[in-house]
UniProtKB/Swiss-Prot annotation:
Binds as a heterodimer with protein bS6 to the central domain of the 16S rRNA, where it helps stabilize the platform of the 30S subunit. It comes from Pelagibacter ubique (strain HTCC1062). This is Small ribosomal subunit protein bS18. Part of the 30S ribosomal subunit. Forms a tight heterodimer with protein bS6. NCBIfam families: S18. InterPro entries: Ribosomal_bS18 (IPR001648), Ribosomal_bS18_CS (IPR018275), Ribosomal_bS18_sf (IPR036870). The gene is rpsR. The keyword Disulfide bond does not apply. It comes from the Bacteria. Belongs to the bacterial ribosomal protein bS18 family. GO terms for cellular component: cytosolic small ribosomal subunit. One of its GO terms (biological process) is translation. Keywords: Ribonucleoprotein, Ribosomal protein, RNA-binding, rRNA-binding. The lineage of its organism: Bacteria, Pseudomonadati, Pseudomonadota, Alphaproteobacteria, Candidatus Pelagibacterales. GO terms for molecular function: small ribosomal subunit rRNA binding; structural constituent of ribosome.
Length: 92
């Protein structure tokens, strides 16, 4: 079969499409996200503090990842441990 040539398949202008997109340009500003549980006056992570634990759980009862909640790695481990303890004691 003979191949068909598509119209409009040629590049228009000297710049490629990738150069025009802003997502491929480096980010000028980098903001550091602070952990909400490491700040001064932050509540202590405890398996009895159910109101705090429910903030870091989905509606289905799964533990939310730290990339969504902005929690540090150390506090994420404490959170997951206390959520699991609260589940075992049927507090959640």
């Amino acid at each position: 079969m003979p191949s068909k040539k598509r119209a409009g398949n040629k590049k228009k202008g000297s710049q490629s499409n990738f150069a025009k997109l802003s997502i491929f340009q480096p980010n000028k500003y980098k903001f550091k996200k602070t952990c909400p549980l490491s700040a001064k006056g932050a509540p202590e992570v405890d398996y009895k503090n159910i109101r705090l634990l429910k903030k870091y759980m989905s509606e289905n009862g799964k533990i939310l990842p730290s990339r969504i909640t902005n929690v540090s790695q150390k506090k994420q481990r404490e959170l997951s441990l206390s959520i699991k303890r609260a589940r075992n004691l049927a507090l959640i």
